[in-house]
Amino acid sequence: MSWQTYVDTNLVGTGAVTQAAILGLDGNTWATSAGFAVTPAQGTTLAGAFNNADAIRAGGFDLAGVHYVTLRADDRSIYGKKGAAGVITVKTSKAILVGVYNEKIQPGTAANVVEKLADYLIGQGF
């Protein structure tokens, strides 16, 4: 399966996230949903935050033109919030999954979908 298929089918296609991307550990975009553009600088900042989250814990982070307040940040997952919407990011051994949800979607539902896809990819060696 292609990275784009994972974005279109396993993330956005579930209805649990409205926008999604898969990034490399260097922050470069491998696949993205339409209209969701993570800049290289944003990807690099996000990728680095999995190793040292101090900066994003203090000041939040930006993705695709939206500033998020950091709710959770560890070496596997970074969760952000903007009003009633938010973002779930999960790191695997080779990629970073990004799933954005809107105010109509429960955060736990979005987190479940992104985390489960990450678990699957980790199990496949990714």
Swiss-Prot record:
Localization of this protein? Cytoplasm, Cytoskeleton
Q: Which GO terms describe its molecular function?
A: actin monomer binding
Where does the record place the region Actin binding? 2-36
Which stretches are transmembrane?
none
Q: Which UniProt keywords apply?
A: Actin-binding, Cytoplasm, Cytoskeleton, Methylation
PROSITE patterns, from UniProt? PROFILIN (PS00414)
Record site: Actin binding: K116
* One GO CC term on file: cell cortex
In-chain residues carrying the UniProt-annotated modification N6,N6,N6-trimethyllysine = K104
Q: Which domain of life is it from?
A: Eukaryota
Which family does the similarity line name?
A: Belongs to the profilin family.
Explain the purpose of this protein: Binds to actin and affects the structure of the cytoskeleton. At high concentrations, profilin prevents the polymerization of actin, whereas it enhances it at low concentrations. By binding to PIP2, it inhibits the formation of IP3 and DG.
Quaternary structure, from the entry? Occurs in many kinds of cells as a complex with monomeric actin in a 1:1 ratio.
Protein's name in the database? Profilin-1B
**Record organism:** Acanthamoeba castellanii (Amoeba)
At the highest ranks, the source species' classification is: Eukaryota, Amoebozoa, Discosea, Longamoebia, Centramoebida
